[in-house]
């Protein structure tokens, strides 16, 4: 039985004003247990394409966001290697291999955009 991995856009505030642009993610991605899914995060050459500072967060309802990937493809200690990150041009991707029930969550991407601003 398939379930949806719900995705929301991550809007961040930078240098005292709302960031001019936001990264684009699909509204939802679905998969069945054991399958692999890839979540895309499209930006511009000013953020995703210009820096290798893309991070991914997982958030379950009522819980704080958890860092899953940083610097495009690095995993913090304790994050299963089922989670992997990559980047091509202005698009970053999070791939979850061997989906498990606990992977159902919101996933957010974030990218450095220069001048201490994040999208």
Curated annotation (Swiss-Prot):
Disulfide bond entries:
41-109
Give the top-rank taxon of the lineage listed in the UniProt record for this protein.
Eukaryota
* Keyword annotations of the record: Adaptive immunity, Cell membrane, Disulfide bond, Immunity, Immunoglobulin, Immunoglobulin domain, Membrane, Pyrrolidone carboxylic acid, Secreted, Signal
The residues that cross the membrane are none
Residues covered by region (Framework-1): 20-44
What is a GO molecular function of this protein? antigen binding
Q: Which residues carry this modification: Pyrrolidone carboxylic acid?
A: 20
Which residue numbers delimit the Ig-like domain? 20-119
Compartments it resides in: Secreted; Cell membrane
RNA-binding as a keyword of this entry, yes or no, is no
> What Pfam families does its record include?
V-set
Its cellular-component GO annotations read: extracellular region; immunoglobulin complex; plasma membrane
Region annotation (Framework-2) maps to 54-70
Residues covered by region (Complementarity-determining-1):
45-53
Q: Where is this region: Framework-3?
A: 74-109
Stretches the record annotates as Complementarity-determining-3? 110-119
One GO BP annotation is: adaptive immune response
Quaternary structure and interacting proteins, as annotated: Immunoglobulins are composed of two identical heavy chains and two identical light chains; disulfide-linked.
Q: Which PANTHER family does the protein's record reference?
A: IMMUNOGLOBULIN LIGHT CHAIN
UniProt name for this protein: Immunoglobulin lambda variable 2-11
């Amino acid at each position: 039985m398939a379930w949806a991995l719900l995705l929301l856009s991550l809007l961040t505030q930078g240098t005292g004003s709302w960031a001019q642009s936001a990264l684009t993610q699909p509204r939802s991605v679905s998969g069945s247990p054991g399958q692999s899914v890839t979540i895309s995060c499209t930006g511009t050459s000013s953020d995703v394409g210009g820096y290798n500072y893309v991070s991914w967060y997982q958030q379950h309802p009522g819980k704080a966001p958890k860092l899953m990937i940083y610097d495009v493809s690095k995993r913090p200690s304790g994050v299963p290697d089922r989670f992997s990150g990559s980047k091509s041009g202005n698009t970053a991707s999070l791939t979850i291999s061997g989906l498990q029930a606990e992977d159902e969550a919101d996933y957010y991407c974030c990218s450095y955009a220069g001048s201490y601003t994040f999208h």
